[in-house]
Each structure stands twice: as C-alpha cells, then as structure tokens.
Amino acid sequence: MVNVVLAGGGTAGHTSPLIATAMALQERGATVSCIGTPRGLEGRVIPEAGLQLDMIPPVPLPRTVNADLFKVPARLAGAVRKAGEVLQRRQTDVVVGFGGYVSLPAYLAARRAKIPVVIHEQNAVPGLANKIAARFAVFVGTAFPDTPLPKARFVGMPLRSQITDLADASGQARAERCARARADLGLDINRPTLLVSGGSQGAVAINEAVVAARTRLLADGVQILHVLGPKNIRGATRITDELTGASWLPMGYVDDMASAYAAADLMVARSGAGTVVETATVGLPTIYVPLPHGNGEQARNATSAVDAGAGVVVANADLDVERLLAETARIHDADVLAQMSAAGRGLMPAHAAEEMAVRVISAATSIDPTIG
C-alpha cells in the first residue's frame, strides 16, 4: 500500500487538480491524505470530497517589502516542522504538490525526510513554490506545454470525472446534459445562456461590467448564470425581464462547475489555468479577461486556447459595457459557437489525473517516474 500526501490549496485553481489526482490515486489503491491551511478553500472542499486533511500554519509571502517579510523565515520554519510531523504520522511514501503557499513547507519537509517529491504546475508561468521544488523533485508535470521548469513534462491538467464525462459527451447526450443542467439550476432550457465567473473568489471588474450590461442582455433574450463569488453575493436576487422572460441568476459559488459548463453556450471568465483547460476540454467558447496583477500568468494561460480559436481575450482595462456586448453577441451565432467549441475539444489532454497517478505511484515504489 502506497501512502501519498498531497499539498495544495488557497483557491480552486490548486484544489481542483489536487482532488482529481487524489481520486485517481485512490482508484489505484493508494492511501491518500492532504495538507492545507486554515485560510484556503481546501478547508471546505477537500473534506467534502471525502479526503482527509491535515492543517499547517499558512506562510504567505508579502508582495512588498514590509515588516511581515522579516517574519517569513520563522513562520516558514514552523510550517516545515508541522508538515514534517504530518508526513511522519502518515508514514508518507511520496509527496505531491500543486503549488501555492501550503506546498513549500511540504516540499521542504519531504526533502529533509528524504521522501520523493512530485510536482504539478497548473500555470503557464510557474509559481515560486514549484520553482524551488522543481530542483529536487523526481517528476514535474505541467498543465501547459513549454512551462519553464526543470524536468517539466506536459501531462495536462488533472480534471475531475464530472469534467471529463462532460468532455466525452457529444450529440444528443450533450444536448440532454445541457437541458438537465439548465433545469436543475432553475434556468430556461431553451434560452441562450451566458455563464459568468471570476473564479472561486469572484472578480469585481467582470461583475461590474456584466451588471452594467445586464438590462441589455436580458432584453436581447440572453439568460445569465452569474457566479459572483461568496463575498459579493449579499443582497443579490434573481432579476427577470418582463418582456423577454430572460433572467439574471446570481450565485455565490458553484461546487459543480461541470453542470454550469453544460448549461452554458458562452462564458465570460478570468483565465486561471483550471478555467482555461476545463472550458477548452468541454468545448465551451469563452471570453477570457486575464487578471491584470501577478506575474502575467493568466494572460499566458489563455494563449493556447485563443490561438486555437477556442476563445478570445479582452484586457481587464478594456472591459466595459460596449465591449462586453460586442463580444457576447456571438452567443446568437450557432456556427461561430460550434467552430469555437470544436477548436477547444482535443486541445488539452483530458485524462491527466490518471497519468499523474501513475507517475506518483512510480515515484513511491522507486520506479523512475519519468520513463514513458
């Protein structure tokens, strides 16, 4: 029996591929547990997925030079110590990290204990934790080709079975999934449907642009499933156009994004790695609005899908009512949507979770995980 500890959290961009890989490992007989921090989304979604979760202290890195920067070494040392205790208690054979500030203590604790480390990097531009650990990891899998990490191997994004099942559905089966998803969400099954989401935390710029354009979209007969983010849902209630009957349906968070994707004809979203890969894989045409902060990874994430014709990019600064209405007008052109959908399907490997599971078990059993 192989004991695997997976580390990653903060947002759905880290937790979703972690959970997908964990499920694939369990299917192969591995004993799986996870490491997270109290600050991240993992505190809810990992236990809900039926996985065991051990908590360690968070060690966020300040974006500017301030007093908190000088506290990082002591905080990191404490988190590494706690992670080491978890690895020892779990009798860990291999650590799998998905980036984010929870991963670095787990990586360093594993290295100290001489436990092999396997990495998955979700973004086209790698984060700091994975950059550090890639130097001593036995296998580095990436969601995008040409990610600049040592020993990187393009495997795709680990996706949960709900996403891969939707990706595999076509024709009548896909149409039935669409109708069922719309009905379950309280939407009209026959109406053009726009899905809007700024990721697990929401996105103010996208939310404001869509709300400003809402009246005109509804008057045009487009219904909107708007995932505002848990911090932005307060006071938001369903709005229906009296003449067209089209509705704006606000939600704080959607646990089953596969159903939201199935219900939609077109999406407006940030270009987090998970969103880009999932929308391309299921063939959902998407208008990507990259987060303008950070190291530019969101703009890079969208490149492959946009170059293939599966989506378009609108800069955050350019997103206003008129631009949004111009880009979403394609929702009425079935031929354009079909072309974009076809361009996305097959662009990314749909079964990366299974490949990652094979590599992880190989690393734990002293088989070279880079072979094959």
UniProtKB/Swiss-Prot annotation:
Question: Could you name the domain of life of the organism this protein comes from?
Answer: Bacteria
Name the keywords, alphabetized: Cell cycle, Cell division, Cell membrane, Cell shape, Cell wall biogenesis/degradation, Glycosyltransferase, Membrane, Peptidoglycan synthesis, Transferase
Asked if the record carries the keyword Amino-acid biosynthesis, the reply is no
Membrane topology label: Peripheral membrane protein
- Kindly list the places in or outside the cell where this protein is found, as annotated in its UniProt entry: Cell membrane
Which InterPro entries does the record cross-reference, listed alphabetically?
GlcNAc_MurG, Glyco_trans_28_C, GlycoTrans_28_N
| Gene3D superfamilies to which the protein is assigned, alphabetical | Glycogen Phosphorylase B
Any idea which positions bind UDP-N-acetyl-alpha-D-glucosamine? 11-13, 123, 160, 200, 298
What is this enzyme's EC? Answer: 2.4.1.227
Q: What class of enzyme is it?
A: transferase
Catalytic reaction equation(s) = di-trans,octa-cis-undecaprenyl diphospho-N-acetyl-alpha-D-muramoyl-L-alanyl-D-glutamyl-meso-2,6-diaminopimeloyl-D-alanyl-D-alanine + UDP-N-acetyl-alpha-D-glucosamine = di-trans,octa-cis-undecaprenyl diphospho-[N-acetyl-alpha-D-glucosaminyl-(1->4)]-N-acetyl-alpha-D-muramoyl-L-alanyl-D-glutamyl-meso-2,6-diaminopimeloyl-D-alanyl-D-alanine + UDP + H(+)
Instruction: Describe which pathway this protein belongs to, using the record's wording.
Output: Cell wall biogenesis; peptidoglycan biosynthesis
Q: Name one GO molecular function term.
A: undecaprenyldiphospho-muramoylpentapeptide beta-N-acetylglucosaminyltransferase activity
Q: Which GO terms describe its biological process?
A: carbohydrate metabolic process; cell division; cell wall organization; lipid glycosylation; peptidoglycan biosynthetic process; regulation of cell shape
- CDD domains on file: GT28_MurG
Q: Which Gene Ontology cellular-component terms appear in the entry?
A: plasma membrane
What does this protein's UniProt record list under function? Cell wall formation. Catalyzes the transfer of a GlcNAc subunit on undecaprenyl-pyrophosphoryl-MurNAc-pentapeptide (lipid intermediate I) to form undecaprenyl-pyrophosphoryl-MurNAc-(pentapeptide)GlcNAc (lipid intermediate II).
Per the record, the similarity remark reads:
Belongs to the glycosyltransferase 28 family. MurG subfamily.
Its protein name is UDP-N-acetylglucosamine--N-acetylmuramyl-(pentapeptide) pyrophosphoryl-undecaprenol N-acetylglucosamine transferase
